[in-house]
């Protein structure tokens, strides 16, 4: 969005070369997706746990965007038309923010946003990873995207349901 607003900055941080931010780490209780992991790789990790997300994942943006855009960028951007946020919120995802001065803090994704393209991140904080709990045995997840065109279109409606049927 820097180019759309014609802003100029003294420094710009490119997180895509930070190896720590490009990792998907599988833990027993959760998947940790680095902020610089491409959308393609992030959705591959998610569909490995939730195969029913495959169709939703292939409708997320166009292939060039999925191969170069990052999940952290999509989440931090906070656009209300972003399809990753409803999915990640339904999956009970948490975001990890890091500051050199204060260390890391973790919060539910829905608590990140305060308004249109606004969030609680401090000027010295960086979104470093998204933590997605593994599915429960009784979980039923469904994701739907309705748009005018099938390929590469913003959602008119994005609906994600995650029910724990015990």
Question: For each of these PLM feature ranges, what is it?
Answer:
Residues 1-166:
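C-terminal structural segment of proteins
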């Amino acid at each position: 969005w820097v180019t759309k607003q014609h802003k100029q900055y003294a420094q710009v941080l490119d997180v895509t070369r930070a190896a720590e931010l490009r990792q998907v780490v599988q833990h027993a209780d959760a998947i940790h997706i680095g902020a610089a992991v491409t959308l393609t790789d992030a959705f591959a990790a998610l569909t490995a746990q939730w195969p029913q997300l495959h169709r939703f994942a292939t409708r997320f943006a166009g292939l060039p965007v999925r191969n170069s855009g990052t999940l952290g960028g999509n989440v931090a951007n906070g656009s209300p038309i972003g399809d990753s946020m409803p999915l990640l919120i339904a999956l009970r995802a948490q975001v990890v923010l890091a500051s050199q001065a204060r260390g890391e803090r973790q919060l539910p994704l829905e608590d990140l946003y305060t308004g249109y393209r606004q969030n609680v991140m401090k000027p010295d904080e960086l979104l470093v990873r998204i933590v997605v709990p593994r599915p429960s045995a009784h979980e039923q997840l469904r994701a739907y995207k309705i748009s005018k065109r099938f390929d590469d279109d913003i959602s008119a409606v994005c609906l994600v349901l995650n029910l724990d049927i015990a």
